[in-house]
Amino acid sequence: RRDQILDAARTLLFSSGLESISISRISKQSELGVGTIYFYYKNKEEIFVALQKEGVTLLYSIIFQISKKDIDHGEKLIRIAKAYYKFSQEQKHYFDIINYFLSSPIVFFEPDLKNQIDMSGRKILVLIKDIVDEGIQKGVFNEKDTKKFSIMFWGTLHGLIHFKKLEKTILEKESHEKLFDYSVQKLIHSIK
């Protein structure tokens, strides 16, 4: 039944977006009673956490494949950035649910749920940090605090992706993707 609930929530997420998800709509979509859903999940945020983990797992698998390629470490970071950009466009609903957790100004999850969310995203930061660490060992990069750089790199990518919404206003006559690529190049250059 847990899978049935997540299938219904995923269907709603992909067909109507994050705002459309409610326990009553999940109940209707899954053909399960509201009480049954509450038996498995305390609230819709717990369902969001499960969907967020799916999205992060998918994104992680893409980034992991890039991290294992036998290419220059700077090129790995470029490809990771491009993969995240592509993910934000092609897996928009998963990106939206990941963003739901990152952009909320308040933490409204119980500590255990918050920890689950944070740990699922931490895996990606560890991959980036490992690439930078390896690049330092090979003399490609020069960075003293690889953890901070990895957080800055990922946070910058995430923020830049959100600037796509400004394409018709602030970024008028600018290609968002070119601005994104330019920024990634500058970030990587900063540690060479």
What residue ranges belong to the model's regions?
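Short, structured helix-loop boundary elements
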Residues: 2, 23, 45, 49, ...
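Helix-turn-helix
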Residues: 4, 12-46, 50
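C-terminal peripheral helix-coil segments that are non-catalytic and often amphipathic
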Residues: 83-86, 126, 130-138, 159-166, ...
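Generic hydrophobic, amphipathic alpha-helix propensity
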Residues: 1-9, 26, 51-59, 63, ...
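Amphipathic alpha-helical segments used for helix-helix packing
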Residues: 90-111, 162-166
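Short, hydrophobic secondary-structure boundary micro-motifs
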Residues: 22, 95-99, 144, 169-173
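Hydrophobic alpha-helical connector segments
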Residues: 50, 54, 64-94, 149-153
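Amphipathic alpha-helical packing segments from all-alpha helical-bundle domains
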Residues: 57, 64, 109-138, 147-151, ...
